[in-house]
């Protein structure tokens, strides 16, 4: 018998299909009197009518609440900066929201930097990433006064030094170290094992050599080390090994070069719930555990505990976002042993959410435009693109009376959907409201 998310058909009912799990949907999500989905007090049917579908809907209050939660939790854990990872979702409005709540912004391209600048975020609140920053991007960053640039290669040391010298400033930099730790995440988004394009090896000596080269350049000053161990992390175990190795690197740098590492940026990666069965750590619990891990590692190494910095992205904006689709076709397909899977085609797909096809990501979907008393049917929500892998939600229980014109809402699409969107098949990109 078919299941979805480990749920047997016998456990699915009309009532459970319409429920909105608090840890999956935005904090302001609720049902109206006719069963319609309400987001922040707004009827999604009205949004679809005014802005069309597909439509990205972002709950500002939810984003701000999560930004404050990270700011406060990590400050208590010893962080001097929490940088919002702009790659997850960026617009002028979102940049303003997170900055107004006390966060800096981590940008990874000239385009992201331009949006942050347009939003009025001061340079000192910005950190710039990227494994292949162009000279033009670096010059813009330095001239704007970006507070920190993360060094990702030997070539980049010379480029940043040249840009800073031309601008007549001393640029603060961090060295991104790969520490051979892989979080329990999908292979394509785990980024701390050694065989990868990011960073400089801690075990092979490249990170220490980068520090040595930076120290010789008058237009650069090293403020710290950076490490990022992956994405969708649900526990702090990976950080324990990573922190120990980065602290050991900091100790070697001090012992051999006399340079004290003042700041340790442990990146982002905190997971969110896409399904009811997902159970990510509370931000305060995660922050406290990581703070304790770093303090313990420093104490064991005999070095002062550096200031901490973090880069949450998905965990701030992901749960705040919902995508609305309109159903176009409903097609029952007979499978083996008489089982039926119903293919529900919507007016978007992999052009607005590539994550299902790219990572095998799972999502939660619900009927958003009305109430239904129909029995559950096993559905596969698919897009309208010319690809068999164009799947939005692989398996979901939806009402058996689903019909063209109904609205579906997919939860937790605030991160890496719009930012990775395309115009495949020349579909226009959805609006954001």
Question: Where on the chain are the PLM-derived regions?
Answer:
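Active-site loop/helix belt of alpha/beta enzymes
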Residues: 1-20, 179-331, 398, 425
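A charged N-terminal "starter" segment
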Residues: 1-172, 208, 212, 216-217, ...
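Charged (often Lys/Glu-rich) extended helix/loop segments that serve as interaction or gating elements
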Residues: 11, 289, 295, 303-433
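Conserved active-site and cofactor/substrate-binding residues in soluble primary-metabolism enzymes
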Residues: 39-42, 58-65, 77, 89, ...
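Short, glycine-/Ser/Thr-/acidic-enriched flexible segments
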Residues: 62, 89-91, 112, 133, ...
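Structural preference for beta-strand elements that scaffold enzyme active sites
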Residues: 81-83, 102-104, 123-127, 148, ...
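Short acidic, glycine/serine/threonine-rich loops at helix termini
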Residues: 94-96, 117-119, 138-143, 160-163, ...
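Conserved residues at the C-terminal ends of beta-strands
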Residues: 129, 152, 228, 267, ...
